[in-house]
């Protein structure tokens, strides 16, 4: 099989590429800079230039390819709405059209559980009516819809929705800021928002990378399917706080803020973040709405059809991650 992965040098992409190489696959990976090209060459991955913002580069990724794994994305929760739609929605639709045109046999798309959004009656699953909370999740959901529209013309696809990724190598996203806030004794290691009973579900990057590899290995069972990949259980925020405090050697959280008070305080840090261009979502008011809504999902479908079996539990994975952060 001729396999190409976009975003092959990113956080998830790096783990996925390593996983496939360890299984004996050969593959191509896209890059957008000379430094990233060298990273791929060092792994014996054939580098292919592609930039989500330059549509003319898309044919490079789909030519002479049987399976295209589209991992590249505009990933932030504090970005520009126009870029979400340009780079996540429109670019995905055009790439899927190019894949169909060039005879790609399977288009595997990395979406997110943010395409589902918060869940009123957890756990949510692949059939849960979506109600994404952030523009990032809305863009992922719209990209999924684009893929299904193109699939009506003959494109074979698989959509994968990982939950919140974490693990060694992760920087500058919501998991990174949340974990390092505890590791460095920041604001979120001192005070919690609300009562802490809301459910949250994480996914270690290595488990998700292995899940994507299973999709490649089980093409028949994964055809035109949607899968959620995550750890096999959710945690209350209180449980997460306890785990992080123990690992970081911090005293247990004793104090909490009401969501209303937290929003008032964060209105000042929100303004600061906007002025400074700081993408840390923990400084934004809308983090309160996120923390006070359930994000818990079932992975039973992936277990049943793919044989997906995540190895990492949160305490083990967070300990490994914090040690990597140093």
Which residue stretches match the model-derived regions?
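Amphipathic terminal alpha-helices
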Residues: 293, 297-305, 309, 313-326
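A conserved pocket-lining segment of Rossmann-fold NAD(P)-dependent short-chain dehydrogenase/reductase
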Residues: 180-203, 207, 211-214, 228
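Mid/C-terminal beta-alpha module of Rossmann-like enzyme folds, strongest
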Residues: 215-282, 299, 315, 319-320
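Conserved Rossmann-fold NAD(P)-dependent oxidoreductase catalytic core, especially the SDR/UDP-sugar
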Residues: 94-136, 158
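Conserved beta-loop-beta element that borders a ligand/cofactor-binding pocket
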Residues: 144-168
